[in-house]
Design a protein with these regions (language model features):
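Residue-level detector of transmembrane insertion/anchoring sites
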Residues: 1, 11-13, 31
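Amphipathic, hydrophobic secondary-structure cores in small proteins
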Residues: 16-58
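C-terminal structural segments of small proteins and small subunits
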Residues: 49-77
Length: 77
């Protein structure tokens, strides 16, 4: 498993806030670094898939367990 450089706890936030906060957090990371996002909004699955495709970032992993969605996103160039 990839070790994240930073973690964003977006649990309890509804669409579009998890993606908005992730975008702000990604601005702090360097190219190739990995952000882990924790969210509870089921809509975040499609949101993160679409956002990473549109933004040039790479969705490395997407998992769900105990009501928490965990995403690993590698920052693009």
């Amino acid at each position: 498993m990839t070790t994240p450089n930073a973690t964003l706890d977006a649990k309890g936030l509804s669409c579009p806030l998890p993606v908005v906060k992730a975008r702000l957090e990604m601005d702090k990371l360097g190219s190739g670094e990995v952000l882990q996002v924790l969210a509870t909004d089921p809509g975040s699955v499609a949101d993160f898939e679409n956002w990473t495709k549109m933004s040039g970032h790479e969705l490395l992993d997407s998992q769900q367990g105990d009501g928490v969605y965990t995403y690993l996103i590698r920052k693009g160039a």
